[in-house]
From Swiss-Prot:
Residues 197-206 are annotated as: G3 motif. Gene3D superfamilies: GI Alpha 1, domain 2-like (1.10.400.10), P-loop containing nucleotide triphosphate hydrolases (3.40.50.300). Signal peptide: none annotated. Residues 1-14 have a biased composition (Basic and acidic residues). InterPro entries: Gprotein_alpha_I (IPR001408), Gprotein_alpha_su (IPR001019), GproteinA_insert (IPR011025), P-loop_NTPase (IPR027417). This is Guanine nucleotide-binding protein G(z) subunit alpha. GO terms for molecular function: adenylate cyclase inhibitor activity; G protein-coupled serotonin receptor binding; G-protein beta/gamma-subunit complex binding; GTP binding; GTPase activity; metal ion binding. Belongs to the G-alpha family. G(i/o/t/z) subfamily. Mg(2+) binds at residues 47, 182. Residues 266-273 are annotated as: G4 motif. The gene is Gnaz. The lineage of its organism: Eukaryota, Metazoa, Chordata, Craniata, Vertebrata. A lipid is attached at residue 2 (N-myristoyl glycine).
Length: 355
């Protein structure tokens, strides 16, 4: 009996040591895994950041992956032009050439088959080129803040010949500029500076935000994306709420949430290139009536940054790390993410008591 008990005790001790080794290994693994949560409203550039991580840290897009984006890019180009043509009537803008009215009818007749096949036929290409070139359509495009139009519209519509070619293969820039609404939760893993990063992107639409809570566990850092150029735009969801006001409200709720007391908070003030272009035409006061500064990129960008940072109610203990970004610019994102990683590592070491 005593011998059998001794054997059982030895086995229990071996089992205990195996568990201890596993726990130590798991603890070390967790310390080397960084969970990044991408948050922000719709159209803030979160999914583009994920694509950039694939380009910078995961080998990019091979030929087959590039080809897979062709139907989406075709859809983006067609959808942009149909939105412009539909907006003509609402904005009471006429075609410069009356013949374009027939082209508009043809556009809507031909787009269904084109989108289902993922290709632009020569007939549809001619229709799209004539419509896009019409001064009336261009005037409507110039008033795109009065209806919903994606940022990539001009990029694709100015290059229809290339996109419509039968042998068209999307470039990396084409892919970065493509727009597909994120639904659900998208995870992307990569290694950088001997750390494993798990970047989690969740949809920014109001209907998607109820899913965010499922991603909060074990978050090392939050990257909150802001659409700088959205200061004059309304939400898709209700066409009334200011996109910037919605972003500020959302940031307030994340920044001051007790769940994230020990979580690094990084603010990506994104689409700086579009803000620089837009601020020359549309004053910042349309969103912030109290703004008295110059309508220059430098002053407007800093003012918007301050609006977000001032929402932090725990300035003594929580720091916000802000960066101005252009999500479609790989070199910019590479530089910023390198700096962000250093901050995350430092804060993580501090949190676990090693710094």
């Amino acid at each position: 009996m005593g011998c059998r008990q001794s054997s059982e005790e030895k086995e229990a001790a071996r089992r205990s040591r195996r568990i201890d080794r596993h726990l130590r290994s798991e603890s070390q693994r967790q310390r080397r895994e960084i969970k990044l949560l991408l948050l922000g409203t719709s159209n803030s550039g979160k999914s583009t950041i994920v694509k950039q991580m694939k380009i910078i840290h995961s080998g990019g897009f091979n030929l087959d992956a590039c080809k897979e984006y062709k139907p989406l890019i075709i859809y983006n180009a067609i959808d942009s032009l149909t939105r412009i043509i539909r907006a003509l009537a609402a904005l009471k803008i006429d075609f410069h050439n009356p013949d374009r009215a027939y082209d508009a009818v043809q556009l809507f007749a031909l787009t269904g088959p084109a989108e289902s096949k993922g290709e632009i036929t020569p007939e549809l290409l001619g229709v799209m080129r004539r419509l896009w070139a019409d001064p009336g359509a261009q005037a409507c495009f110039g008033r795109s803040s009065e209806y919903h139009l994606e940022d990539n519209a001009a990029y694709y519509l100015n290059d229809l010949e290339r996109i419509a070619a039968p042998d068209y293969i999307p470039t990396v820039e084409d892919i970065l500029r493509s727009r597909d609404m994120t639904t659900g939760i998208v995870e992307n893993k990569f290694t950088f500076k001997e750390l494993t990063f798990k970047m989690v992107d969740v949809g920014g639409q109001r209907s998607e935000r109820k899913k965010w809570i499922h991603c909060f566990e074990g978050v090392t850092a939050i990257i909150f994306c802001v659409e700088l150029s959205g200061y004059d735009l309304k939400l898709y969801e209700d066409n009334q709420t200011s996109r910037m006001a919605e972003s500020l409200r959302l940031f307030d709720s994340i920044c001051n949430n007790n769940w994230f007391i020990n979580t690094s908070l990084i603010l990506f003030l994104n689409k700086k290139d579009l803000l620089a272009e837009k601020i020359r035409r549309i004053p910042l006061s349309v969103c912030f009536p109290e703004y008295k500064g110059q309508n220059t990129y430098e002053e407007a960008a800093v003012y918007i940054q301050r609006q977000f940072e001032d929402l932090n109610r725990n300035k003594e203990t929580k720091e916000i790390y802000s960066h101005f970004t252009c999500a479609t610019d790989t070199s910019n994102i590479q530089f910023v993410f390198d700096a962000v990683t250093d901050v995350i590592i430092q804060n993580n070491l501090k949190y676990i008591g090693l710094c």
